[in-house]
Amino acid sequence: MTSWLLRKPVWVSLLLLVLVVPWFFVHLPHSWRSPLLLAVWDLCHILFFFCVVYAVQWRYKLVSARSWFLVAALAFAVGGSIEMIQGMTGRNASWGDVARNMTGVWLGLAWGVAQAQWLRWHRVLSAVALAVLFVPFINLAVDRVKSFNEFPVLANFERPVGVDYWRGDVSIAAVPGRENANGHALKVELNTARYSGFYFEHFPADWRGYKRLHFDLFNPGEKSLTMVLRVHDIWHQQSGQAYGDRYNVRFQAEPGWNSYQFALDDILNAPTKRDMDLSRIQTLGIFTMNLPQPVTLYFDNFRLEP
């Protein structure tokens, strides 16, 4: 019995190629590069190589072990070379992309010919590989749904995947003294650079209807630190990220636990030439300047309050 795919003409595969190929040459704006969208982007490697090999299989019926080996070797060489070139030109090289390429090749080879007894395990293994590579996407999709369901909580760090939405030297860890409390926080390593901190993006952007931004901070050190909170909306890029076009405020991180509240009216009125668009908040950042030595801080319970 032929598979569902084999009952479809090869133009389905070619049509998918036409739809997928342009995306390899599109430069996404930074504001669009959410972890979830990048995970979808990664899966396009599987779809692309599957479509190419499936179309070749439909036309030439590659069934010998030698032909399969040659196709796989060629795909590995091409994909690996592209990743090496990207690494040498300052772009991110990813062997995960090579694994996705090879999974697409394997799927195309195994499903592009008529059913045969010897193909059964190839198809099972290729399907398992596909499922494994879908796990990060599924985790991010589930986390995204949970983040919207938990809003106005922006982040509480009880889900490991949540760290994907933060930029900086950060990790999710237990706070010293609370290791047995089943509570986690964002561990931030600050260095001695002129500006050292972190940024939070791709959270629910509509902050209208709330009055305060709240978060907690634990400073395990013995000295107070001067920190800066900055918030901007999606239109901030149009100003060239001018200082006067965003919200900036200093606050003190005293030793031990600290709780902070910042009025959203102040964020609304912060830009000098316009109002902040509270329906399109894009980035929240916290940083310090010119530390004499590295410092570790813990942040928790980012949320909006009525």
PLM segments and residue spans:
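Residue-level signal for secondary-structure boundary sites
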Residues: 194, 223, 237, 270, ...
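Extracellular beta-strand ligand-recognition surfaces/modules
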Residues: 215, 259-302
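Bulky hydrophobic segments
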Residues: 1-96, 102, 107-195, 201-205, ...
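Short, solvent-exposed mixed-charge patches
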Residues: 305-306
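Asparagine-centered strand-capping/turn motif at beta-strand->loop junctions
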Residues: 217-221
